[in-house]
């Protein structure tokens, strides 16, 4: 999926994430040939960029002896923010399943950090994924959204978010 639009050199997102992972672990990458199978459609809102960033970091970790101790999942999540600033997509790619994620501001001007939890979901719930037939860049899709949200709509949506998380765990 998307092979015609994916870079095949050092600018490839998976390669950049792998190199960043090696740097974070202070490790030298071994020689390797990378072949990717892109099963997540690009430009459809399913998190292909987040998956590429997380996948690259996890691959670098797996190629370094003791990498699991040198690069924790939390560090993977936060390094991946350098490539994809959507912790919801990143946490889904890293942990799988249902996630609630958020950005935490340091208040000091340092980059935001991300955190995530994986609430228990009732086992009878089955996810449904709808894939649009045509792609659209995330920046363009978000560009058509209003910069302001009505206060009552925001409050309503916030209350329903908590309700959704609760409801997904109930019989």
Task: Annotate each PLM feature.
Residues 1-44, 62-70, 106:
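ATP-binding N-lobe of GHMP and related small-molecule kinases
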Residues 1-8, 38-47, 80-87, 147-152:
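A short glycine/serine-rich beta->alpha loop
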Residues 8-12, 46-54, 155:
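Short, conserved micro-motifs enriched in small and acidic residues
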Residues 11-18, 53, 127, 138, ...:
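A general structural signal for well-ordered alpha-helical segments in protein cores
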Residues 13-20, 55-63, 75, 79-82:
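Generic beta-strand or strand-like secondary-structure segments
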Residues 23-24, 58-61, 152-158:
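Glycine-rich loops and low-complexity Gly/Arg-rich segments
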Residues 46-69, 94-99, 104:
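DPxDG-like acidic metal-binding loop motif
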Residues 69-171:
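ATP-dependent small-molecule kinase catalytic core of the GHMP/sugar-kinase superfamily
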């Amino acid at each position: 999926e998307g092979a015609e639009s994916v870079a095949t050199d050092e600018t490839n997102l998976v390669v950049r994430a792998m190199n960043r992972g090696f740097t974070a672990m202070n490790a030298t990458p071994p020689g390797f040939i990378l072949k990717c199978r892109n099963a997540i459609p690009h430009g459809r809102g399913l998190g292909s960029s987040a998956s590429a960033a997380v996948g690259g970091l996890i691959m670098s970790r797996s190629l370094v002896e003791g990498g699991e101790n040198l690069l924790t999942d939390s560090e993977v999540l936060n390094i991946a923010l350098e490539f994809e600033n959507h912790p919801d997509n990143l946490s889904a790619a890293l942990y799988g399943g249902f996630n609630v994620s958020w950005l935490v501001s340091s208040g000091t001007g340092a980059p935001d950090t991300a955190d995530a939890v994986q609430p228990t979901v009732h086992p009878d719930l089955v996810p449904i994924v709808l894939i649009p037939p045509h792609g659209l860049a995330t920046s363009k899709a978000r560009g058509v959204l209003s910069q302001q949200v009505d206060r009552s709509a925001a409050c309503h949506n916030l209350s329903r978010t908590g309700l959704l998380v609760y409801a997904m765990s109930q019989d």
